[in-house]
From Swiss-Prot:
Belongs to the class-I aminoacyl-tRNA synthetase family. MetG type 1 subfamily. It comes from the Archaea. CDD domains: Anticodon_Ia_Met, MetRS_core. This is Methionine--tRNA ligase. It comes from Hyperthermus butylicus (strain DSM 5456 / JCM 9403 / PLM1-5). It holds the Pfam family tRNA-synt_1g. Its EC number is 6.1.1.10. A motif ('HIGH' region) lies at residues 11-21. Transmembrane segments: none annotated. GO terms for biological process: methionyl-tRNA aminoacylation. The gene is metG. Gene3D superfamilies: HUPs (3.40.50.620), Isoleucyl-tRNA Synthetase, Domain 1 (1.10.730.10), Methionyl-tRNA synthetase, Zn-domain (2.20.28.20). GO terms for molecular function: ATP binding; metal ion binding; methionine-tRNA ligase activity. The keyword Transmembrane helix does not apply. It catalyses: tRNA(Met) + L-methionine + ATP = L-methionyl-tRNA(Met) + AMP + diphosphate.
Amino acid sequence: MGRWIVASAWPYVNSIPHLGNLIGSILSADVFARYLRLKGEDVVFVSGSDEHGTPIEVEAIRRGVHPKQLTDQAHEYVKKLFEEFRISFDNYTRTENPVHKEFVREFMMKLYQNGYIFEQDDVLPYCPRDKMFLPDRFVVGTCPYCGFEKAYGDQCDNCGRLLHPTELKNPRCSICGGPVEFRKSKHWFFNLPKLQEKVEKWLRESNLPPNVKNYSLNMLKEGLKPRSVTRDNKWGIPAPFPGAEGKTIYVWFDALLGYISATKEYGLKKGDPELWKKYWFNPETKTVYFIGKDNIPFHAIILPAMLIGSGDPYVLPSYISATEYLMYEGEQFSKSRRWGIWIDEALEILPADYWRFALIRMRPEAKDTNFTWSEFLRIVNTEMNDDIGNYVHRVLRFIESKFGSVVPEPGSYSDADKEFEKAIRETPRRAEKYFEEVRLKQALGEVIELARKGNQYLNTKAPWDKIKTDPKDAATTMYLAVNSVATLAILLAPFTPDSAERLWKMLNLPGSVHEPGRWKQAGEMIIKPGHRIGKPEQLFRKLPARFDKEIASKLQEIRRKVMEKRPPLLRW
């Protein structure tokens, strides 16, 4: 049994996550964690609400409340939505949790004591109109490297370069739109150049995917610069360094350490305060991070540097799955323009399994992907229903009507039978290969392909005719078919957990499809002759043929219902 930490990027809870946030980290991480559990691995799956920093502070001021009132509502609501999406966290926590706050302060002091944190004056953006120092993300200007006119003060979303606000051309305040000034303020910095050699050695020897590894090595070629770890805003974890009164820890350093503190909190809940070290200090532990591509520098450079700089034997990232962007009907999701679908709106439209399946099929693994309602309709009606749902229903209904719900004894295998049995046995191995490469879209593709082969097999064998002329051949066909359905149930479990469990019950199989170690039964003939199946039901339901044309006109009413359910401080 292997030991794994599956880490999803922490959603920033100044708003409800949208579909792009969901597939970029949380859902992908959940599918992978569920797969590992099915394999019988020892898994801790962690994430939490990222709730510090100026964006939330500004939103709270706008609403006339303390930031914690806002994040209390947001955290509980988002946590509930993830539960409804069947996200199987072992611990979903928050950056306001006392365990996290204490851990961050202790960790940052270790970096300080080890000589990796130093103090110096910094020149920071200040908005004279709003009378406040601005966080990097609240400064917008032209990127000095690529000329992108909407680059942020910490990073250009176009070319991906990490920036300092002073590098931007024509910097402006994103709150009021006015020009910013730069004023001196004392701050504490993480000495990344001092750790560059160690980070580069680790990167070159790592098994990170090419998009992450190459991007990070290119950044190292330019040379790392010290990064400020403190901010002047009030809402955050107080900086622990001598003389740093009134400063808070920069939210990125705060949130990155959440993966460890969440594991620590998980151990405390289980009554074992040292459990987290059995994962994080064990060189055999594999740590897999699920993030969006814009977060690569923080996870592939800054986090490893922090872990190395601590002097403790932390295991460094084993794999970083960084997705490209999911667009919505050709444009980026936008809260201000109400452009996109947010996860509570999605659940108002259809149950979670439909979204889980469709989003994994659209997962932007190699390039930006466009969510369209027409593609969503095709996936639901063709792949979920025609390919998988229809096949399952054909098999179970035939056994119910022609064999009295009892799985028949097979006869000798024809070439077609042998070929289909081979497909049943080999599909889990192919899906497993894609899972190990964190190519979840392709793994789900193997599940769909097995169902397609099943439909073709039934059409070729025509058991509805053979039951009259060669009942033994029909029995063989249905014996193999029902076992392929059992394999489908196991393979679907990471993707559509509720539907997979319902299918397991329809097959009248013992226990839960989600039991640890269940994966080893995929591809095996686990349903024996004489087994009685349960009552067949429709696994999925089709959407109306004009769903993609009509959904736009229905969104306004859907959003009205959703807004009524949202906590008051999360209504737009």
